[in-house]
Amino acid sequence: MYSTECTILLIEIIFYFLAAIILYDMLHKMANSPLLCIAVLTVTLAVTSKCYAQNYGINVPITGSMDVAVPNKTDDQIGLSSTLCIYYPKEAATQMNDAEWKSTVTQLLLAKGWPTTSVYLNEYADLQSFSNDPQLNCDYNIILAKYDQNETLDMSELAELLLYEWLCNPMDVTLYYYQQTSESNKWIAMGSDCTIKVCPLNTQTLGIGCKTTDVSTFEELTTTEKLAIIDVVDGVNHKANYTISTCTIKNCIRLDPRENVAIIQVGGPEIIDISEDPMVVPHVQRATRINWKKWWQIFYTVVDYINTIIQAMSKRSRSLNTSAYYFRV
């Protein structure tokens, strides 16, 4: 950086030195030749008058007021340099029962500025398995999550899991006690049946309100859930208990937000709003809800508002194996 600045400074010094020599030579000649003096003054006055004249442009018609905000057209071309992934449940394709539905959706997105080669429609079997290995590989990722009251899956916890990066380590509760050290430190449990019980311990490793040798005295935090983000009192050791054959639990640290991921809840009585959750950073705007209709109507709505959704997101700025976030050790 410094070598470039020195080079520019040297060029400027040489330029001004040469300009001074030329000016001195011209003044010397003008002093000896009145005709040359008159010619130089005439050219100077002619050029100066053009510099201060009003420039109306050439062949540029002016209509209406010039005090108009000009929109930034570069935003309209975002699809030309970005990839878009839309993740949908298997039941969507089953209900639409149309072999050409993907082609139809991509053609509709083309009208919104997204080339067909930049759009990927990815199917997942169920939310629990998808959240376990999400494969969020596009510049922009939109997840359609259908609400099901019969599913033992908390949509707000699913949103928190997918909208943030996590660094996790496996927990061996048969050998060790565990404690959470900060607000961003959580335990994430996944499986077909996660019933988590804990017993808080004092400094002598004796149970607080429970017996470490009697699981029935443990405090039950979750019951038969498929996904649970568990928050206990920071700085206190806990002895945990769960059924290893139907559930896994990991000690995780919540990292930065995945700003290139958005979740759309399809149906359900409430809108996903994890900003109300004290466990997460507030003001998350990348989660919303669409009233449940037919899946064709859902996709039409997504296509119609695709660029509005994208504006609430940020393009992926670095290479990251997002699918491995839950299994990193």
From Swiss-Prot:
Primary localization class, coarse: virion
Keywords, ordered alphabetically: Calcium, Capsid protein, Disulfide bond, Glycoprotein, Host endoplasmic reticulum, Host-virus interaction, Metal-binding, Outer capsid protein, Signal, T=13 icosahedral capsid protein, Virion
GO cellular component, one term: host cell endoplasmic reticulum lumen
Ranges where the record places region CNP motif: 168-170
Family, as annotated: Belongs to the rotavirus VP7 family.
Biological role: Calcium-binding protein that interacts with rotavirus cell receptors once the initial attachment by VP4 has been achieved. Rotavirus attachment and entry into the host cell probably involves multiple sequential contacts between the outer capsid proteins VP4 and VP7, and the cell receptors. Following entry into the host cell, low intracellular or intravesicular Ca(2+) concentration probably causes the calcium-stabilized VP7 trimers to dissociate from the virion. This step is probably necessary for the membrane-disrupting entry step and the release of VP4, which is locked onto the virion by VP7.
Protein name: Outer capsid glycoprotein VP7
Organism, scientific name: Rotavirus A (strain RVA/Turkey/Ireland/Ty-1/1978/G7P[17]) (RV-A)
Taxonomic lineage from the root: Viruses, Riboviria, Orthornavirae, Duplornaviricota, Resentoviricetes
